[in-house]
Amino acid sequence: MDNVIGLEIIEVVEQAAIASARWMGKGEKNTADEVAVEAMRERMNKIHMRGRIVIGEGERDEAPMLYIGEEVGICTQPDAKKMCEVEQLIEIDIAVDPCEGTNLVAYGQNGSMAVLAISEKGGLLAAPDVYMKKLAAPAVAKNHVDINKSATENLKIISECMDRAVEELVVVVMDRPRHKQLISEIRQAGARVRLISDGDVSAAISCAFAGTNIHALMGIGAAPEGVISAAAMRALGGHFQGQLIYDPAIVKTGLIGESKEDNMKRLKDMGIEDPDKVYNAEELASGETVLFAACGITPGTLMEGVRFFPNGARTQSLVISSQSKTARFVDTVHMFGETKTLQLK
């Protein structure tokens, strides 16, 4: 699966990023998301596979395309059955966020990207649109930090594992009222805080790359993005833990349902028997082979955003494989029209 689909999923996120980037700075976050969804789905349907969306734009009645349960790929099309022999058929589960950080795109801010993760069937946790408490840290701190420990304890552990003072650590936290106490604790411990308005996938995986000046992600964000982050962190060897948050009283507002009971039922309907379980990266992305791909829409810590020029654009993407244990940055020049995409070496 790695060799067959790796390059194609790069093109999937590239097309989504280019489509969304055309709406950068126009204040139209919904449009920026919609065009990314359409572009991602169109390119995905050209891949020789039978794919199933396990994390997408919402449940079937909430989204017109890339909804949870939707099948994508050539081998799901009625007129392509002859092309898809059973013994050669690749069946995969897919988690997507065609425009992570819609507000960032709408207002021309840094950090938005098109992302997806894939694995063989059953290899990704099907997480509904609830929240997730998250902890991401560098590989050297893997299995030493713990989401059930305080921020102060975890910062001390990270500083010891990295052989640096707590004051030299930078922790990314989403700028939300629910994180007021967490932010205060991190600062009192001596570490520095980088607040972000949206898009915590990039922050999570940046912990696994030296030189990003990001050493931890803490706090509560969306669960679907947590699974996508876990897919990347599993392949990179970084630390990631997530615990589903299904009680609206904890977050006050956002993605989840009207009551705790409603959300518990939704979790059970999706096969999650223990809603309080703490998952690690290997449990959130448990497949034998896991691939992660992202393409910058606006500039970020890891990738440049889409840069347009007359009749073309330049993108920077990242593809991570658990099988080959590699993270590849791909710099691509796209010549619009009939000219094929050129990849810079």
From Swiss-Prot:
One of its GO terms (molecular function) is metal ion binding. Keywords: Calvin cycle, Carbohydrate metabolism, Hydrolase, Manganese, Metal-binding. InterPro entries: FBPase_class-2/SBPase. Substrate binds at residues 100-102, 131, 176-178, 198-200. It holds the Pfam family FBPase_glpX. Mn(2+) 1 binds at residues 33, 57. It catalyses: beta-D-fructose 1,6-bisphosphate + H2O = beta-D-fructose 6-phosphate + phosphate; D-sedoheptulose 1,7-bisphosphate + H2O = D-sedoheptulose 7-phosphate + phosphate. Pathway: Carbohydrate biosynthesis; Calvin cycle. It is an enzyme of class 3 (hydrolase). This is D-fructose 1,6-bisphosphatase class 2/sedoheptulose 1,7-bisphosphatase.
